[in-house]
């Protein structure tokens, strides 16, 4: 049988060997509505990706959320920014045919308060909501758990690669009056990077002074600490590029498309590859957090960017505000590889050798031909970032 076309994205250095761990078999799909699901979305689609369990009492996530473990939320709203209301801090969420909630585990509800999916398509397994928590929501698409988990594996590889790349950024020229020895990366002057957040098992983040980023691509805040706390402080920004960060970034004000702070939300990266526990206590974190091994205990405050964590527990009205990392800039110098794994349709543990595939680019040009080896695997050469199909 001719394999179905598969569309993939190559992200920088990617996920190399991961960008697709394609298992060539067709999962069953059941639609509970006539809504057209275009796919499970790429990593830039999600406001939060949780590789374990998620719980919430109050608060919300303004954008889409993906949860690989179980979800237990009360008094909570998903894609709150879909309303476009005046109280939304992040960018408005628009339904483009990708999940507003992607759930691989079970849906639970240990308290009586409401749980609201404001808009969009919920994607989960048929066993996820046995208690009918979403019984009145008719925009649900059911997928096999293996297909959903494959998407999380893709995301995890991307997040790990971001952390590896962040660890390679170094500076020996800190900018005066800025926090944590932030200075230009020695290899890429378009990136600022911290130099005083490593070598500690625990790290407390209080007031943070950030340099102007009008002519920079990113600020990388990298720490190898295992325990991190955001508390008793604010993030201040050198808005006018005068050499002093005096403007407090207002992380609770309604979204303003002309705010000078918007560029910060897409350019600041908090890279915590070794973190096991992160706490926020009423703190407005600016930028995206990459901590796939950490349990994030968020008590009030917000994260104004994407959230990539092992577990997420929201209390005290904590909110995820709908801002995304500028992935296009982060990936612009990257390449990646594609790995294909061919398995038997009736026994996914049986790998098949000799299967032939073509990798086709966006111009419908065959850029490489692959054949699986005795392990049922084939790996492409380095490919530029872009959209590809496997035929």
Regions picked out by a protein language model, each given a short descriptive name:
Residues 3-4, 132-182:
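Secretory-pathway luminal glycosyltransferase catalytic domains
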Residues 4-28:
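Sec-dependent N-terminal signal peptides of Gram-positive bacterial secreted proteins and lipoproteins
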Residues 7, 130-133, 144, 148, ...:
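Solvent-exposed loop/turn and edge beta-strand elements of beta-rich ligand-binding domains
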Residues 71, 101, 122, 191-192, ...:
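Hydrophobic beta-strand residues in large extracellular and virion-surface proteins
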Residues 81-153, 157:
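Core subunits and conserved enzymes of cellular information-processing
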């Amino acid at each position: 049988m001719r394999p179905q076309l598969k569309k993939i994205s190559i992200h920088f250095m990617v996920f190399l060997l991961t960008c697709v761990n394609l298992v060539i078999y067709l999962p069953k799909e059941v639609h509970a509505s006539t809504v057209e699901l275009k796919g499970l979305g790429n990593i830039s689609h999600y406001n939060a990706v949780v590789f374990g369990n998620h719980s919430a009492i109050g608060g919300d996530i303004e954008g889409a959320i993906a949860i690989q473990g179980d979800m237990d939320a009360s008094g909570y709203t998903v894609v709150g920014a879909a309303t476009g209301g005046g109280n939304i801090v992040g960018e408005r969420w628009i339904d483009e045919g990708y999940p507003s909630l992607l759930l691989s585990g079970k849906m639970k509800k240990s308290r009586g308060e409401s749980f609201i999916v404001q808009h969009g398509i919920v994607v989960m397994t048929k066993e996820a909501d046995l208690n009918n928590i979403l019984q009145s929501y008719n925009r649900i698409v059911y997928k096999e758990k293996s297909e959903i988990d494959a998407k999380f594996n893709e995301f995890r590889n991307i997040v790990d690669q971001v952390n590896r790349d962040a660890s390679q950024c170094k500076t020996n020229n800190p900018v005066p009056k800025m926090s944590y020895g932030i200075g230009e990366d020695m290899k890429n002057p378009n990136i600022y990077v911290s130099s005083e957040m490593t070598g500690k098992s625990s790290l407390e983040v209080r007031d943070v002074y950030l340099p102007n980023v009008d002519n920079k691509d990113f600020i990388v805040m990298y720490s190898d600490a295992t325990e991190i706390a955001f508390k008793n402080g604010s993030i201040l920004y050198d808005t006018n590029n005068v050499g002093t960060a005096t403007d407090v970034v207002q992380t609770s004000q309604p979204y303003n498309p002309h705010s000078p702070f918007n560029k910060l939300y897409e350019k600041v990266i908090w890279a915590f590859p070794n973190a096991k526990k992160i706490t926020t206590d009423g703190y407005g974190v600016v930028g995206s957090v990459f901590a796939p091994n950490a349990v994030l205990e968020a008590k009030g405050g917000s994260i104004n960017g994407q959230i990539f964590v092992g577990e997420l527990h929201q209390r005290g009205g904590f909110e995820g505000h709908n801002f995304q990392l500028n992935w296009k800039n982060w990936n612009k110098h990257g390449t990646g590889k594609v790995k294909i794994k061919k398995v038997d349709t009736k026994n996914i543990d049986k790998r098949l050798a000799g299967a032939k595939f073509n990798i086709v680019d966006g111009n419908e040009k065959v850029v490489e031909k692959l054949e699986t080896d005795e392990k049922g695997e084939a790996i492409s050469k380095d490919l530029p970032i872009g959209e590809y199909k496997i035929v």
